[in-house]
Amino acid sequence: MADSQIQNFNHLKIHSQFSICEGAIKIDDLKEISKEKKIRSLALCDTSNLCGALEFAEKISKVGTQPIIGTQINFKLDDTIGLLPLFALNEIGYKRIIELSSLSYLNNDGTSDPHLNFEEL
């Protein structure tokens, strides 16, 4: 992919080292890639947590890349669990994602991964 194509591409589901067993890239590495490729925006979308959100936002914005904060929540419908990416548009959205992420752990009976059901969304 040419550099100009990379610059215009917005990756919306990056999993960092905070997505255990799913992502391995470190925030510092994302920062360097963003700077080198002049990427306009990136979305951090770790699974069931926002542990890297502050570090990501601070470091990525320093190299001129717009950080997009999100998470990937396990969503249960009947007996099926799927993945639902959620992104914050602003501070209110960020706080709501924090609430939903916490709720996915608090209401979990321990027999499955943290998840939300339709009513909780």
Q: Residue ranges of each PLM-predicted region?
A:
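Phosphodiester-processing cores and adjacent nucleic acid-binding clamps
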Residues: 1-121
